[in-house]
């Protein structure tokens, strides 16, 4: 069963660049320590940016996220899963609907809602159990929004905080869609088209403004 969560997929793909990134950042004596090291490399080394052209599958592909040095939650989750698999750690991508109470005016205007469907996270098989890790928001972005960056120790689930440092509502998990061997891109794109029609159709040349 775990072989499927070690294999490369179309979006949780494996390239020489991903293998090199994983080899460079997988530091530690055991799988848990290496997974933690990879988590921080993806969380902080790849900038979070939701202003992408989601009609292009490249927004969801791990190798493309690594090449650009930025991505949104699903793309960053794909990259962490890819790196973990390259290091021999079984990994799968999880998807959930969340309500983000602390978004930017520009993003809220484009999306038309604070509901984020198909938010991406990762589950890693460590010390005999699946553990959740959420590498989406890099430290610099969290500091800007006064949200504690998510830490990960490889033993406890790491999901978004319910409140920020000022005790304002931050992230509210509404529905979990389960976990996947690879990213169900067509399913996500179809839902994005239905819910975020203007945002979905935004082209990259019109999306140069950084999120944070």
Region roles according to the model:
Residues 2, 6, 10, 98-212:
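His-Asp-centered catalytic microenvironments across diverse enzyme cores
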Residues 1-68:
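Secondary-structure boundary elements
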């Amino acid at each position: 069963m775990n072989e499927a969560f070690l294999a490369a997929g179309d979006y949780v793909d494996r390239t020489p660049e991903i293998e090199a990134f994983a080899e460079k950042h997988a530091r530690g004596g055991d799988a848990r320590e290496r997974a933690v090291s990879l988590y921080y490399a993806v969380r902080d080394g790849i900038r979070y940016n939701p202003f992408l052209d989601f009609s292009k599958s490249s927004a969801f592909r791990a190798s493309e996220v690594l090449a650009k040095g930025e991505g949104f939650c699903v793309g960053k989750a794909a990259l962490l899963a890819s790196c973990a698999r390259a290091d021999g750690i079984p990994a799968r991508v999880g998807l959930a609907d969340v309500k983000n109470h602390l978004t930017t005016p520009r993003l809220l205007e484009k999306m038309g809602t604070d509901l984020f469907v198909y938010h991406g996270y990762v589950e890693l098989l460590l010390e005999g159990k699946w553990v959740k890790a959420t590498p989406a928001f890099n430290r610099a972005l969290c500091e800007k929004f006064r949200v504690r960056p998510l830490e990960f120790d490889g033993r406890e689930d790491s999901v978004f905080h319910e409140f920020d440092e000022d005790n304002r509502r931050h992230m509210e998990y509404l529905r979990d869609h389960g976990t996947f061997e690879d990213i169900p891109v067509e399913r996500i794109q179809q839902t994005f088209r239905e819910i975020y029609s203007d945002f979905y159709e935004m082209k990259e040349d019109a999306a140069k403004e950084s999120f944070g």
